[in-house]
Amino acid sequence: LLVHDRPIRRHADDSIVRIVAGREQVLRRARGYAPLPIAIRRAAPPLLAVGGHLKNTVALARGGEVFLSQHIGDLETPEARRAQEAAADDLARLLAVEPRRVACDLHPDYASTRFAHGRGLPVAEVQHHAAHAWACLAENDLEPPALAVCWDGAGWGPDGTVWGGEFLAVDAEDCRRMGTLRTFPLPGGEAAMREGRRAALGLLWEMLGPRLFDQSALAPVRNLTASERINFAAMLRRGLNSPRTSSAGRLFDAAAALLEVCSVSRFEGQAAMELEFAARRAGPPPPAYPFRCVRSGGAAAELDWRPTFAALLAEHAAAQSPAIPAARFHATLAAMIVAMAQREGRERVLLTGGCFQNRLLLELAIAGLRRAGFRPYWHQRVPPGDGGLALGQAVAVARQANGEEGDGCASASRVKS
């Protein structure tokens, strides 16, 4: 055998594509797709967009096109960060374009944000969920107005809190937060991304307060050690390392833990995936659980999931299998989307963010919106998750920059509350 470990000059993973609602949907855009351009409605100045921290891609905008790089991955390691820099430089050389500004996420601690600020160019910070919305709008070749349903695990909100269950009214130049999921605390912060039981405890605290630790029939409580009970009670009571979040992704994790489907994930998205698999065993979609939609003054409407989880827990206590409660949970989230679309009254509804990698949720939402007379749009050529952020960042800045030079785009596409 003649072998040689040749260095990889330009890495490119295999692309991942599936069929959703009869159409192709790209989940990982790499070999065979990148760096093919996405056409955009407004010409962009020479611009580099550096994406987010997870599932990173970068993009180079030139005129009426945005060239999206191959999937780079999570920027947790020095090797990944060097790959991001190489991908950005490769695009500039390939297209013979010298970027004159950089777009990045609003999160101050992302490696991609630090990379953007280190380029020595004017920087435009684009709010995470606004970038999701603009990406979905652009790849579907649409113009505002639209309602964007932006559901994912986490994104830095302009108010400094952790967003993730957002409804944005997308207009010609900006986005407005017109609805959100009710927030709840996440004991342990980022640890809750791996341990759905933490999300479940935070959710139960929001529903029951200190009484949650008396609910030994519930798996997330029953399986706590004595020291864990003390520590979690102190964290939640005093708000220590327990940031509040509106994340739809963490609702999936909490539901999976409460239904005893998955309490601790071995890989990203495991809890939500197992919950979807359990729901598919239920057969035809059952009816949704109750929920409330509350609006106070001029603030964004709030979808209150507490009636949903009260009903889910009651049904789970009497059920032989998690299948029906899991299916009804999915149906409820789809019903929430339709309810908010009806409140806002915008015909076009964009379904974007990592939660819409869940095919059951996506197809239920599409069907429900169509029955209610709306026109749903979702990602097909660009991933619905953070792999599409760079496209959205480029589009947001292109819409606000209007081809002007200088650093006046420093606050591009902040979301208005």
What are these regions (language model features)?
Residues 161, 212-220, 394-417:
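Acidic, glycine/GT-rich loop-and beta-edge segments that sit at the periphery of enzyme/chaperone cores
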Residues 47-49, 103, 146-150, 245, ...:
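Short glycine-aspartate micro-motif
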Residues 52-90, 205-347, 360-367:
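A contiguous, well-structured pocket-lining segment that forms one wall/lid of small-molecule binding clefts
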Residues 35-47, 125-148:
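Conserved phosphate-binding catalytic cores of ATP/NTP-utilizing and phosphoryl-transfer enzymes
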Residues 96-108, 345-357:
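Short glycine-rich phosphate-binding loop at a beta-alpha junction
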Residues 1-42, 244-245:
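Internal gly/pro-rich beta-alpha loop/helix module
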Residues 140-205, 237, 242-246, 252-258, ...:
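Active-site histidine-anchored catalytic micro-motif
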Residues 120-132, 348-349, 359, 365-389:
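Conserved phosphate-binding/catalytic loops in two-lobed NTP-binding clefts
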